[in-house]
């Protein structure tokens, strides 16, 4: 019979997702039902994304929040506007604090983004439109762009 040394497993650096949740969700469908009949062409979609990171009271626990806003328009109507704040609570275990910024800005958002994307797709479909499928986001590129802007 062999024994497993759990001490080495506990010392392994890893990210634990303790919770995921919708903090705020709003969908406006201001021109319905007229806008639903006028969907011959693809609407123009304006999309914005922001990431907020909050250090929670417990050591190495952080809330990472994705703020996603999308507005769809055609030449006649504002079709819909959706705003979602989706967050996760992450515990960075046995990870050097110098690595926290990149993990919290890149890896943690990438872990929760698919869930936020699904919520937006479902809500827009439930509003009578084609589901808004947001393209995958390169959080690493966003992080490096933000870092280079801060250096300039």
Curated annotation (Swiss-Prot):
GO biological process annotation, one example: protein transport
Keywords assigned = Chaperone, Cytoplasm, Protein transport, Translocation, Transport
Q: What is any one of the record's Gene Ontology cellular component terms?
A: cytoplasm
Localized where? Cytoplasm
Stored InterPro entries: SecB, SecB-like_sf
Q: What is its main location?
A: cytoplasm
Q: Where are the transmembrane segments?
A: none
Q: Which first-to-last residue range defines the signal peptide?
A: none
Pfam families, from UniProt? Answer: SecB
Q: Which GO terms describe its molecular function?
A: unfolded protein binding
As for what it does, the entry says: One of the proteins required for the normal export of preproteins out of the cell cytoplasm. It is a molecular chaperone that binds to a subset of precursor proteins, maintaining them in a translocation-competent state. It also specifically binds to its receptor SecA.
Quaternary structure and interacting proteins, as annotated: Homotetramer, a dimer of dimers. One homotetramer interacts with 1 SecA dimer.
Family designation: Belongs to the SecB family.
Q: Which PANTHER family match?
A: PROTEIN-EXPORT PROTEIN SECB, PTHR36918
Report what the protein is called: Protein-export protein SecB
Q: Which organism is it from?
A: Rickettsia felis (strain ATCC VR-1525 / URRWXCal2) (Rickettsia azadi)
Gene name on record? secB
């Amino acid at each position: 019979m062999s024994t497993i040394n759990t001490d080495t497993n506990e010392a392994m650096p890893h990210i634990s997702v303790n919770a995921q949740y919708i903090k705020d969700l709003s969908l406006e469908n201001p021109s319905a039902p007229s806008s639903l009949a006028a969907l011959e062409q693809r609407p123009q979609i304006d999309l914005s994304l922001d990431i907020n990171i909050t250090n929670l009271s417990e050591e190495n626990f952080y809330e990472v929040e994705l703020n996603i806003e999308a507005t769809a328009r055609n030449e006649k109507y504002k079709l819909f506007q959706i705003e979602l704040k989706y967050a996760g609570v992450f515990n960075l275990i046995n990870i050097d604090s110098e690595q926290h910024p990149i993990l919290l800005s890149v890896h943690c958002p990438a872990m929760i983004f698919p869930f936020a994307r699904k919520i937006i797709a479902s809500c827009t479909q439930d509003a009578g439109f084609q589901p808004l499928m947001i393209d995958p986001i390169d959080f690493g590129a966003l992080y490096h762009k933000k870092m280079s802007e801060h250096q300039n």
